[in-house]
């Protein structure tokens, strides 16, 4: 009997030890999960205050493509502008999030974008999300979605640890604000809904409410000043110059040298949109005069202008050596290799 009792005691002790081990493992797992959640919730600020998320010329065209590192982030036109990624060879396409996406800014661990799920089809799951519009931050792996502003927003620019963006208020209308990438310190910079173009710690914009002059404003706020008078729209910055369209001259393309404040007319025809190579050597633009409509390229040194493809296109985006663009009616998308000017269909596979 004593031997049997010892065996029972040993079995009971082993059972208690096993339970304690399981309890310790569960506690450690919970601690690990909690630590991982805290780490993911913690905002990773940029060390470089000069960090940017996209070019002003891409943002002029809706910010549907952006690049960070070796990855291109884009709004897939064949999946209701859902957020996707691919490598720089236009392969390994992956869906990141189901939002209708525009004004993409990408840098480091994060992607910032404007959500417009009100434009989604009625059968889309994204239409039933908590908020159909707003400014959002998401990790590049598709996790950790964070709402930074919940009402409609439009163009946005990432600079360092701040986002300069147009936000809509039902009482005040469209205004220019600055917010931290953590969603804190949301500060109004301008009462008018100017589209911000940022370079050298300065915000450039064309007036909206009282004039269409070209203005500048410090990124820290203060009083804006006029740097060039006229009737301009479609502003962007490339390589020390501002590009814009002159509304007094039938929307012809112009360039303002910021060092001399000399304005040069680059085209003599009406254009609808444009994009500029990063070195300013070439401008790709859409002629919109009703007779010669098409995609053209301008050599800014020689002044030579060449039609690359006839038709009506928009959303011109330059990423590395590629120009992405779409049919005006959204029926097809294309990509052109800037080296040989060969145009192909761009039809990324749709993921569920």
Where are these regions (language model features)?
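Repeated scaffold domains used in trafficking and secretory/extracellular systems
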Residues: 59-66, 99-108, 150-160, 190-200, ...
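N-terminal Sec-pathway targeting helices
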Residues: 9-30
């Amino acid at each position: 009997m004593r031997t049997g009792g010892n065996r029972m005691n040993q079995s009971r002790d082993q059972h208690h030890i096993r339970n304690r081990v399981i309890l310790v493992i569960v506690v450690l797992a919970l601690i690990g999960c909690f630590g991982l959640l805290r780490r993911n919730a913690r905002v990773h600020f940029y060390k470089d205050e000069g960090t940017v998320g996209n070019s002003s010329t891409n943002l002029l065209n809706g910010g549907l493509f952006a690049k960070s590192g070796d990855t291109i982030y884009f709004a897939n036109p064949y999946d209701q502008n859902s957020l996707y990624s691919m490598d720089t060879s236009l392969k390994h396409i992956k869906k990141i999030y189901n939002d209708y996406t525009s004004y993409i800014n990408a840098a480091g661990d994060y992607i910032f974008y404007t959500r417009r799920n009100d434009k989604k089809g009625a059968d889309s799951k994204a239409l039933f999300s908590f908020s159909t519009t707003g400014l959002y931050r998401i990790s590049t792996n598709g996790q950790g979605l964070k709402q930074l502003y919940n009402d409609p927003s439009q163009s946005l620019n990432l600079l360092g640890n701040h986002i300069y963006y147009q936000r809509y208020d039902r009482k005040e209308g469209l205004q220019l604000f600055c917010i931290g990438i953590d969603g804190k310190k949301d500060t109004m910079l301008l009462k008018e809904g100017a589209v911000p173009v940022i370079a050298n710690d300065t915000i450039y914009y064309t007036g909206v409410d009282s004039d269409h002059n070209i203005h500048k404003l410090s990124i820290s706020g203060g009083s804006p000043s006029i740097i060039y008078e006229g009737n301009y729209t479609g502003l962007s910055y490339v390589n020390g110059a501002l590009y814009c369209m002159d509304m007094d001259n039938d929307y012809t393309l112009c360039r303002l040298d910021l060092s001399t404040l000399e304005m040069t007319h680059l085209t003599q025809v009406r254009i609808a949109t444009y994009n500029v190579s990063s070195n300013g050597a070439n401008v790709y633009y859409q002629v919109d005069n009703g007779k010669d409509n098409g995609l053209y390229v301008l050599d800014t040194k020689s002044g030579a202008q060449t039609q690359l493809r006839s038709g009506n296109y928009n959303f011109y985006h330059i990423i590395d050596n590629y120009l992405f663009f779409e049919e005006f009616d959204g029926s097809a998308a294309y990509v052109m290799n800037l080296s040989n000017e060969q145009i192909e269909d761009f039809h990324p596979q749709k993921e569920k």
